[in-house]
Amino acid sequence: MASRMLPLFLCACCALGLSSGDGSSSLILPKEVHFRTLRQLTFGGQNAEGYFSTDETKLIFQSTRDSLQCDQEFVMDLASGSVRMISTGRGRTTCGYFFPGDTLVLFSSTHHLMSNCPPRPDFSKGYTWAVTPEYDIFTARPDGSNLHRMTTTPGYDAEATISPRGDRIVFTSMRNGDLDLYTMNLDGTGVRQLTHELGYDGGAFYSWDGSMIVYRACHYEDSASASVYRQLLSQNLVRPLHMEIFVMNADGSHRRQITFNGAANFAPFFHPDNRRIIFASNVADPQGRDFDLYLINIDGSGLERVTYNETFDGFPMFTHDGRKLVFASNRNGKVPHETNLFLADWRE
């Protein structure tokens, strides 16, 4: 996000125009049969990774808006539409998530090591993501107070989410020289490495019963691609063109790959039945630019396309009863590539 200080409170009905997000069907595209209604929650800027509080009355999300130059963390009250920035306004943030009970949130931030936004990736090397080494994981109250740094190891620590059991945090770290998944206790102790294959393991979420973890990964077995990966990683970059979805037990055992399509598959999240996973993929677009949501069984069978937007749909999360789904989308944007949050009433 940008190094600027927004007013802490934004009136969503004024600044975000929530009065037009009436939960109608006008935003639902043909073939999107799982959406009963669809309501737009944000209007303008870049808004993504919206995740419910455990009581499902609020969302935490990252946004670049107004005078911001890169993402900060915000909390939205779904009943009133009010939005509050809870991060410092310095550096850049990512990957916010509520603790069980909603007394705390976590997110990753660079503010303690840099006031300005981190440099953008150099696309002369092709399409890449930055794995900014200044990222550490922080906790705070949902109003942004009591900010506390949780990770202190050198290198990238981000992409953290919490088990519904309320006992462990899963996150991605480069502390051992590669991008692997780790878990830790809610106070940051008891760190344990779960993945060890060369490549980028990230974007992990627990199943609703806390027994499994779903994540996306790109692994490199041939020497040429491994060499390119290592070279980019030495510059704090990754090339996320081919990522597959994996599931494992919460202790890291019984890892299995469930997609094999060679596309960019990411943002997986468990359906409340713990037997299916919703995720984003560009598998249907030969050019690789159109991302839609898909459902798949945890054994890799039963792939079903959920959205049919021609640009981007991603970062889905269900409520615990499976009746609502929040996700980010480029649909209905006023300018190209604008990304907003949407809330769907879900039907099977």
Predicted features, each with a name:
Residues D22-R36, Y135:
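Blade/loop signatures of beta-propeller domains
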Residues S26, T37-Q69:
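Beta-strand-rich domains and repeat architectures in extracellular enzymes and scaffolds
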Residues T37-Q40, G81-R84, Y127, E134, ...:
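Predominantly a core beta-strand signature of beta-propeller blades
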Residues F43-Q46, S63-E73, T88-T93, S108-I137, ...:
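A flexible loop/linker signature enriched in serine peptidases of the S9 family
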Residues T54-D55, P100-G101, P164-R165, W208-D209, ...:
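Residue-level detector of Asp-centered blade-edge/turn motifs that repeat once per structural unit
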Residues L59-I60, V105, I169, I213, ...:
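Hydrophobic beta-strand positions that form the internal "hydrophobic ladder"
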Residues D77-G81, R141-S145, N185-T189, N249-S253, ...:
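Short loop/turn segments that connect beta-strands within beta-propeller blades
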